[in-house]
């Protein structure tokens, strides 16, 4: 049912219906129509309640956990509406692995007659957006009279008459964006052909030699690119495009990964030898290792270690020399974000100043099996292949070549070394435009954890080290990095031990005479798996780990008991392991505090970028930016444009863009403008009270009712398809109650 909290816009109609001039003029959104400030219209059934104690309304100081909104922007609501309390903090695990969480499908059954509104809608559906009758591919992209016979002939279930399709089976053209197809406008041609929802802007009727009128698609050669299907090379501004043949070879187990296979065999062989030698020594030998009375114990111990190491099989090959990396204060990082971290969103963040980006987390096994959806995660926009901006006056890293660097990296996770190694070798060959390959050891989602991936690797440090060492060996010039959490349990943080192992190498590595695993960077999320997002990130612990990393990097004798100097190819390419902090970064103050006070090289921004993508702009300028409602709406429009370019402007592409735009709005609606806050800095953990904006559009953008998000999407994508569905990720946004009695 409709919520009593729905924002009402005076004389407003959805895009495509009468009265759209309130939103648009000549197809463009007119944010100026929202200059007057109007409150949310809330039905008051009882006496108003105002229980928020902040400095703004007479309270003393800043109330912990509640956003300090100025008194004049607070809304007094009745007890019957149930809105007096601040909104609950949403479970943001989905920002790390939403689609894998949705696959889990678990969840206890709801008891009682009122549905529980907390938690997540695990089994979400989005309906289908498609034409009433689809156009056959043999005519979808060609002039009306093109001689392209259909192999199915009269038995084909799709339409072949273009005029009939346009008149009867395709919805009317959209009049947003001035009625001009954003894809055609950007690229000079539209890959959606006759199925485009803006096809009227790039079609024409011409007269043929025999006097007939023929419909044709129009292209603008001056703006067209020349796409190529060469593996991994740019196609219409997108890189890392994997061919169908390669994915099919993977699916049929015909794709060869010789390096991964031989290295996996070596890992298995050496692991058995190490296990036998480490745990099979007799007690007398073990007792004699520390030393003896004549002081010759150290020499004897080294001789014994040298003899032991001679028993082990040498690795089949050593890692290739890696591309030099740099992480610093001028390179804020956009975290890997499943679902939300899609190509259009990353492209938007790069526009706003993000210097480094990551793909959504991909499952190694799915990559090895040739999954189309998983390999699609490797695609990146051409803007992500540009070098990150660095300070040219500063000596950064020896032999660092900024011109060879790029912004985009990929993140994977896996539960077995052979899977991770095969995925890494395939990615190295098929996706050349990668800055790094990052191993996710922090994903808290139950399904991922139960498979032994994600944060489960934190409790299996030896296996993780083998995986990273092997990935480093097969990844060519692409460096390997790792993202971890404090540990799996609140009471037992293990990150310090794990960091020491990853930088120095574990006991097994020293047993066989090998050095560290060769990771180029480590990112620490300042929470445990058990904690999830329930409390603030522990930057004190991150600071301790940063000091540890600095100390280990400064050690000249890596591995105090090693016999030989470690091979340079086992070492980080930059001569040091970079250390990144992650957690609750929501402003430029948080960012620079992390670098200056906690000692990290740079900060990885996750939810802060989801709520306000211009956080990167704030970091670059070193100040808060009080974005107006019209400026924020312009970012929504830009996301819609980028979405149509990425997913297409046909019915399916518009539906897909709408779905991800609504996911985007499910985070951005949490933003409270800094201009209406009593205190700064804002905290991402603060729950917002009921508030109104400085004008009606600002109020609309802050609505937590998903029906208002759909209204916003219709400003740019027109009315939703009749079969389109959107279920908010968080049940608290759904406003749906099971009727009683």
Swiss-Prot record:
List, in alphabetical order, the GO biological process terms annotated in this UniProt record: mRNA processing
Report if keyword tRNA processing is assigned.
yes
Q: Specify which residues bind FMN according to the UniProt entry for this protein.
A: 336-338, 411, 483, 525, 582-584, 606-607
InterPro entries per record: Aldolase_TIM, DUS-like_FMN-bd, tRNA_hU_synthase_CS, Znf_CCCH
Gene Ontology CC: one annotated term? nucleus
> What reaction does this catalyse?
5,6-dihydrouridine(47) in tRNA + NAD(+) = uridine(47) in tRNA + NADH + H(+); 5,6-dihydrouridine(47) in tRNA + NADP(+) = uridine(47) in tRNA + NADPH + H(+); a 5,6-dihydrouridine in mRNA + NAD(+) = a uridine in mRNA + NADH + H(+); a 5,6-dihydrouridine in mRNA + NADP(+) = a uridine in mRNA + NADPH + H(+)
Q: Where is the composition biased (Basic and acidic residues)?
A: 96-106, 300-309
For this UniProt entry, the molecular function terms from Gene Ontology, in alphabetical order, are: flavin adenine dinucleotide binding; mRNA dihydrouridine synthase activity; RNA binding; tRNA-dihydrouridine47 synthase activity; zinc ion binding
Localization (cell): Cytoplasm; Nucleus
Q: Which UniProt keywords apply?
A: Cytoplasm, Flavoprotein, FMN, Metal-binding, mRNA processing, NAD, NADP, Nucleus, Oxidoreductase, Repeat, tRNA processing, Zinc, Zinc-finger
Q: Which family does it belong to?
A: Belongs to the Dus family. Dus3 subfamily.
Q: Kindly provide the name given to this protein in its UniProt entry.
A: tRNA-dihydrouridine(47) synthase [NAD(P)(+)]
Organism, as annotated: Ajellomyces capsulatus (strain NAm1 / WU24) (Darling's disease fungus)
């Amino acid at each position: 049912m409709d919520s009593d909290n729905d924002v009402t816009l005076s004389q407003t109609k959805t895009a495509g219906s009468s009265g759209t001039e309130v939103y648009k003029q000549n197809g463009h959104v007119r944010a100026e129509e929202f200059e007057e400030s109007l409150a949310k219209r809330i039905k008051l059934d009882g006496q108003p309640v105002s229980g928020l104690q902040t400095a703004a309304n007479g309270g003393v100081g800043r109330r912990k956990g509640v956003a300090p909104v100025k008194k004049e922007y607070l809304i007094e609501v009745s007890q019957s509406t149930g809105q007096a309390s601040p909104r609950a903090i949403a479970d943001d695990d989905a920002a790390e692995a939403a689609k894998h969480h949705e696959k889990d499908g678990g969840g206890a059954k709801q008891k009682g007659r009122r549905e529980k509104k907390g938690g997540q809608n695990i089994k979400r559906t989005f309906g289908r957006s498609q034409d009433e009758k689809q156009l056959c591919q043999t005519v979808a992209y060609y002039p009306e009279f093109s001689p392209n016979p259909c192999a199915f002939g009269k038995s084909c279930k799709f339409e072949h008459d273009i005029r009939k399709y346009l008149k009867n089976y395709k919805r009317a053209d959209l009049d947003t964006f001035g009625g001009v197809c954003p894809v055609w406008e950007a690229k000079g041609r539209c890959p959606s052909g006759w199925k485009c929802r803006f096809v009227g802007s790039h079609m024409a009727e011409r007269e043929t030699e025999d006097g007939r009128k023929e419909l044709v698609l129009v292209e603008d050669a001056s703006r067209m690119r020349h796409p190529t299907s060469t593996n991994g090379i740019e196609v219409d501004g997108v890189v890392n495009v994997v061919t169908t043949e390669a994915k099919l070879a993977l699916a049929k187990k015909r794709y060869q990964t010789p390096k991964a296979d031989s290295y996996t065999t070596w890992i298995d062989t050496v692991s058995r030898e190490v296990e036998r030698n480490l745990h099979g020594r007799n007690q007398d030998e073990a007792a004699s290792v520390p030393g003896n009375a004549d002081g010759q114990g150290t020499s004897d111990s080294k001789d014994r270690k040298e003899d032991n190491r001679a028993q082990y099989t040498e690795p089949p090959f050593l890692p290739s020399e890696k591309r030099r990396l740099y992480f610093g204060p001028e390179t804020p990082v956009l975290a890997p974000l499943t679902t939300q971290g899609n190509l259009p969103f990353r492209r938007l963040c790069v526009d706003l100043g993000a210097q480094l980006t990551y793909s959504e987390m991909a499952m190694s096994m799915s990559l090895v099996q040739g999954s189309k959806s998983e390999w699609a995660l490797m695609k990146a926009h051409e803007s992500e292949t540009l070098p990150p901006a660095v300070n040219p006056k500063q000596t950064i890293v020896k032999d660092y070549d900024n011109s060879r660097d790029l912004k985009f990296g990929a993140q994977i996770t896996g539960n077995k070394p052979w899977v991770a190694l095969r995925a890494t070798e395939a990615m190295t060959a098929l996706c050349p435009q990668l800055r790094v390959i990052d191993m996710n050891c922090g994903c808290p989602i139950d399904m991922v954890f139960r498979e032994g991936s994600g944060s489960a690797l934190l409790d299996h440090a030896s296996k993780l080290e083998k995986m990273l060492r092997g990935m480093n060996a097969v990844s060519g010039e692409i460096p390997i990095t790792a993202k971890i959490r404090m540990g799996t349990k609140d009471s037992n943080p293990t990150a310090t031990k794990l960091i020491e192992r990853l930088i120095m190498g574990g006991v097994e590595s020293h047993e066989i005479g090998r050095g560290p695993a060769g990771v180029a960077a480590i990112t620490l999320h300042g929470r445990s798996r058990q904690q999830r997002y329930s409390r603030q990130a522990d930057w004190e612990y991150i600071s301790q780990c940063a000091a540890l990393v600095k100390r280990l990097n400064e050690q000249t004798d890596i591995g105090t008991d090693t016999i030989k100097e470690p091979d340079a190819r086992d070492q980080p390419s930059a001569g040091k392991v970079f250390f990144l902090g992650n957690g609750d970064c929501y402003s430029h103050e948080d960012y620079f505090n992390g670098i200056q006070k906690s000692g990290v090289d740079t900060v990885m921004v996750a939810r802060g970028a989801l709520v306000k993508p211009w956080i990167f702009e704030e970091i670059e300028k070193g100040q808060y930016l009080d974005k107006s409602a019209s400026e924020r709406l312009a970012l929504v429009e830009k996301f819609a444009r980028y979405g149509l370019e990425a997913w297409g402007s046909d019915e399916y592409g518009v539906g897909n863009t709408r779905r991800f735009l609504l996911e985007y709005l499910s985070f951005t609606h949490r933003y409270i403008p800094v201009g209406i806050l009593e205190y700064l800095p804002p905290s991402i953990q603060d729950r917002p009270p009921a508030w109104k904006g400085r004008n009606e559009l600002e109020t609309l953008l802050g609505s937590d009712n998903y029906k208002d998000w759909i209204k916003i999407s219709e400003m740019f994508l027109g009315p939703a398809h009749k079969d389109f569905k959107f279920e908010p990720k968080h049940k608290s946004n759904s406003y749906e109650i099971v009727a009683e009695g």
